[in-house]
Amino acid sequence: MKFALTGGGTGGHLSIAKALAIELEKQGIEAIYLGSTYGQDKEWFENSPLFSERYFFNTQGVVNKSFFKKIGSLFLQAKAAFKAKEILKKHQITHTISVGGFSAGPASFASLLNKIPLYIHEQNAIKGSLNRYLSPKAKAVFSSYAFKDKGNHVLTSYPVQNAFFDFARTRTEIKHILFLGGSQGAKAINEFALLNAPKLTKQGIKITHICGPNSYEQVRFFYQELGLLDKIELFAFHNNITEIMHRADLCVSRAGASSVWELCANGLPTIFIPYPFASNNHQYYNVLEFEKENLCYVVPQNELLPKKLFEVIRKLNQKDDQGNKNLTTISNQLQQKIAKDGAKTIIETILSA
């Protein structure tokens, strides 16, 4: 028995691949990885001991591209699919798991050509174009969101790494706010943090700001101009995000699925600012269920005024009829919403098929 994991491009897809690879390793099952030279795949897995072999194809996505660029991208995808077909055959792969993203294309199609069972994990509440096409052809589609076209869909807990659960805690007071710009940096969140920093620090609230590597120098300059650089924690990125989340009492974040469920597992109340240009507005739908259950606050990017942060802080500090702060209630309920061992459940479901 030997697995192929494929897909990625961004940290959200890749974190799922990592969680599944860790579970395969725990169960003593060998795995290879097939991704792309474009995006973050190599950064995550080029030297990863989780895989016996790693392959990266010259492929790109087709979303938001001109007609001719789409044709070029599809040609590269087709070329890579035939290479992937030979790789899967060489390694005698018995199961393929796709975590989505454009880099999943070649190995997913190659698996179908080789008649290797294909399993898909759809991370978002709205399917990406590749997963929409491949879903009917897959053995099973795992997701933490309920889809109307149930078919071969399996509802599972999101495959969050156990460290997010291990570092969870119940929040009782807002003393520390985390601004999470993400691996690519979110300009709107970076600006929101800078606008609120003077008042927050004056109130004695600590700030940790992860602004993304491309924005680091500019954001650092503005904190310096505000005279706050030595009063806040600023990072381009951080390798130990679980420890950073553990210290925070409130987070401001985009609404990529992995971030949403990692924050949920950590019990960290969050203000989500969905990326307005995400395909099919999927970031908004990723947190819609949470918002309906009063487990988060969602602020559209075009309504992101500094006063919004303090409005949310006031609401979180209010108490219910039993005398419990909304902050504490939300923190507790978030931890109850997601079960540990989502990756284990997915792998065991595949093995029992």
Curated annotation (Swiss-Prot):
Sections of the chain in a coiled coil: none
GO CC entries: plasma membrane
Binding site for UDP-N-acetyl-alpha-D-glucosamine: T10, G11, G12, N124, S183, Q283
Cell division listed as a keyword: yes
Lipid bilayer topology: Peripheral membrane protein
Catalytic activity annotation: di-trans,octa-cis-undecaprenyl diphospho-N-acetyl-alpha-D-muramoyl-L-alanyl-D-glutamyl-meso-2,6-diaminopimeloyl-D-alanyl-D-alanine + UDP-N-acetyl-alpha-D-glucosamine = di-trans,octa-cis-undecaprenyl diphospho-[N-acetyl-alpha-D-glucosaminyl-(1->4)]-N-acetyl-alpha-D-muramoyl-L-alanyl-D-glutamyl-meso-2,6-diaminopimeloyl-D-alanyl-D-alanine + UDP + H(+)
Primary location class: membrane
EC numbers for this chain: 2.4.1.227
Pathway: Cell wall biogenesis; peptidoglycan biosynthesis
Molecular function per GO: UDP-N-acetyl-D-glucosamine:N-acetylmuramoyl-L-alanyl-D-glutamyl-meso-2,6-diaminopimelyl-D-alanyl-D-alanine-diphosphoundecaprenol 4-beta-N-acetylglucosaminlytransferase activity; undecaprenyldiphospho-muramoylpentapeptide beta-N-acetylglucosaminyltransferase activity
SUPFAM superfamilies recorded: UDP-Glycosyltransferase/glycogen phosphorylase
Record InterPro entries: GlcNAc_MurG (IPR006009), Glyco_trans_28_C (IPR007235), GlycoTrans_28_N (IPR004276)
Translocase keyword on record: no
Superkingdom per UniProt: Bacteria
Keywords: Cell cycle, Cell division, Cell inner membrane, Cell membrane, Cell shape, Cell wall biogenesis/degradation, Glycosyltransferase, Membrane, Peptidoglycan synthesis, Transferase
Gene Ontology annotations of biological process type: carbohydrate metabolic process; cell division; cell wall organization; lipid glycosylation; peptidoglycan biosynthetic process; regulation of cell shape
Compartments in which it is found: Cell inner membrane
Function: Cell wall formation. Catalyzes the transfer of a GlcNAc subunit on undecaprenyl-pyrophosphoryl-MurNAc-pentapeptide (lipid intermediate I) to form undecaprenyl-pyrophosphoryl-MurNAc-(pentapeptide)GlcNAc (lipid intermediate II).
Family: Belongs to the glycosyltransferase 28 family. MurG subfamily.
Listed HAMAP family: MurG (MF_00033)
Protein name per its UniProtKB record: UDP-N-acetylglucosamine--N-acetylmuramyl-(pentapeptide) pyrophosphoryl-undecaprenol N-acetylglucosamine transferase
